[in-house]
Structure formats: C-alpha cells, structure tokens
Amino acid sequence: MHAFSKIRLTFNQDGPQSHEDDSAGIAVQDAKPTLQAPPMYKVVLFNDDYTPMDFVVEVLEVFFNLNRELATKVMLAVHTEGRAVCGLFTRDIAETKAAQVNQYARESQHPLLCEIEKDG
C-alpha cells in the first residue's frame, strides 16, 4: 500500500506587505566559496634503544603499506637520525595511524613512539 500526499509550497503569495523591497527572505550568494585543501600532517616514528628493527619494518609494512625495501629505508632513517616521517595524511587519518601504531607497540611490549606533526 502506498500513501501519496500532495504538498503545495507557497511563499509570500500576496506580494510584499510589510517589506520595502521584493527580495526580502531570499538568500543571494555573491560569490562562489573558495575551496582549500585540508591541512596535512606528518606521521613520525621516533627511535628508541629497545624496539627491534624487524618490528619497526613490520609496523611500516602493515600500517603504512610500505614495501619491504622502502620500510627498511625508513627504519634505517629512524635508527640513524632519531626520527623519520612515515607518511603525510589529513589530520584524522594521521591521528588514527599514530594511535594504531602506539597501541600495537604497547601490545607487543615495545616502547616505539609514533606522533603527528602539522606539515609546513
């Protein structure tokens, strides 16, 4: 069984009564809004003296979808420079990835630290 209803929408049928001009109640957009790309955030891994290199490579492969070669390069940068950028993402994705890495590291009993920083 289908129910149909007819709705008639009318606006100011009698013309302007208490308004001085005919455009009262009408919204007019002057210009198209400008769209901007969302701010990007770096996901950064920090070196520590206890997390095994194999574990860092695994994290980079699993959470950042890096191949073995690139994951190894990033891991070596973390090891030699103290930190390295794992990827550049919008804020919500960067926060999620950092939280996932930190949770996985804690569950695996490693002190690996992952944080986000605003790009630029």
UniProtKB/Swiss-Prot annotation:
InterPro entries: ClpS, ClpS_core, Ribosomal_bL12_C/ClpS-like. One of its GO terms (biological process) is protein catabolic process. Pfam families: ClpS (PF02617). It comes from the Bacteria. NCBIfam families: PRK00033.1-2, PRK00033.1-5. Involved in the modulation of the specificity of the ClpAP-mediated ATP-dependent protein degradation. Binds to the N-terminal domain of the chaperone ClpA. Belongs to the ClpS family. This is ATP-dependent Clp protease adapter protein ClpS. It comes from Pseudomonas syringae pv. tomato (strain ATCC BAA-871 / DC3000). The lineage of its organism: Bacteria, Pseudomonadati, Pseudomonadota, Gammaproteobacteria, Pseudomonadales.
